[in-house]
Design a protein with these regions (language model features):
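Sec-dependent signal peptide recognition
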Residues: 2-10
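Hydrophobic h-region of N-terminal signal peptides that target proteins for export
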Residues: 9-18
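Intrinsically disordered, low-complexity sequence elements enriched in Ser/Thr/Gly/Pro
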Residues: 1, 19, 89-92
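Accessory carbohydrate-binding/adhesion or oligomerization-edge regions at the termini
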Residues: 19-77, 81
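Hydrophobic alpha-helical context, especially transmembrane and signal-peptide helices
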Residues: 4, 23-24, 77-79, 102, ...
Length: 136
């Protein structure tokens, strides 16, 4: 009897799994349209405040980059100078269109190094400490 119940549960479970619709997500690589600042900012508002490019309010100056990007790729290999070990900031604008009711968007970082903090506008939403590991 136990074997029959187990077999029925297994059949029902397999039938349920075979009919389940798995919604696969859409992946978009966010490699373009990034800005980078070598150095620190006073607070997160300085990274998100609107300022026209080239205006006097666009200070500190942000440099356009494509990811992956290493902010000390040149000075780290020069034996005659100390390489930069300070903070660096990256920012971009994302147009998020979630097609699923009550769905969610996941940001998967393929590699963010050492100490990373992620902000959406001015709210810190995630952090990571470690090597260039992948994390979500």
């Amino acid at each position: 009897m136990k074997r029959l119940i187990y077999t029925l549960c297994l059949i029902i479970g397999c039938a349920t799994l075979s009919e389940a619709k798995v919604l696969t997500g859409h992946k978009t690589r966010l490699t373009d349209n990034w800005l980078y600042l070598r150095g620190d900012i006073g607070n997160i508002w300085e990274a998100v405040r609107p300022a026209a490019p080239g205006s006097s309010e666009c200070v500190p100056l942000w440099t356009p980059v494509t990811l992956p990007h290493c902010f000390n790729a040149t000075d780290a290999v020069d034996p005659d100078m100390n390489y930069y070990q300070g903070p660096g900031w990256y920012k971009t604008l994302l147009d998020i269109q979630n097609p699923y009711p009550n769905g969610r968007i996941l940001l998967d970082f393929e590699g963010a190094g050492q100490k990373t903090e992620v902000y959406i506008y001015t709210t810190r939403v995630a952090s990571h400490i470690g090597g260039y590991d992948e994390w979500t």
